[in-house]
Swiss-Prot record:
Binds to the N-terminal domain of the chaperone ClpA. This is ATP-dependent Clp protease adapter protein ClpS. InterPro entries: ClpS, ClpS_core, Ribosomal_bL12_C/ClpS-like. It holds the Pfam family ClpS. It comes from the Bacteria. One of its GO terms (biological process) is proteolysis. Involved in the modulation of the specificity of the ClpAP-mediated ATP-dependent protein degradation. SUPFAM superfamilies: ClpS-like (SSF54736). It comes from Nitratidesulfovibrio vulgaris (strain ATCC 29579 / DSM 644 / CCUG 34227 / NCIMB 8303 / VKM B-1760 / Hildenborough). Belongs to the ClpS family.
Length: 104
């Protein structure tokens, strides 16, 4: 007869933890160009990356000043999806805005 939730024959005093690994994380970067408007970049940051207007403006200015700015850090699938959404919206609006991902 079992004295706990474990199957018969198992010692309920010994618990084995599984090796839990966190997923690799990726940063999403926006790259500066001479054609995409600052307003469009801010709108992308607000709509796609859920930034506040103040955060979006700060990131947009970093992109403009430094040539690149970080939008956020996500799991691989989320980062790649957000980058694809940025590219699709930029192309639809006629902008050459580039977005990339890199492992943290």
């Amino acid at each position: 007869m079992s004295n706990g939730p474990l199957a018969p024959g198992y010692d309920s005093d010994i618990l084995v933890e599984d090796d839990v690994r966190l997923p690799r994380m990726y940063r999403v970067l926006l790259h500066n160009d001479d054609y995409t408007t600052m307003e469009f970049v801010v709108s992308i940051l607000v709509e796609v990356f859920r930034k506040t207007a103040e955060q979006a403006t700060a990131i947009m200015l970093a992109v403009h000043r430094d040539g690149v700015g970080e939008c956020g850090v996500y799991t691989f699938e989320v980062a790649e999806t957000k980058a694809a959404i940025v590219h699709a919206r930029a192309r639809r609006e006629g902008y050459p805005l580039r977005c990339s991902t890199e492992e943290v």
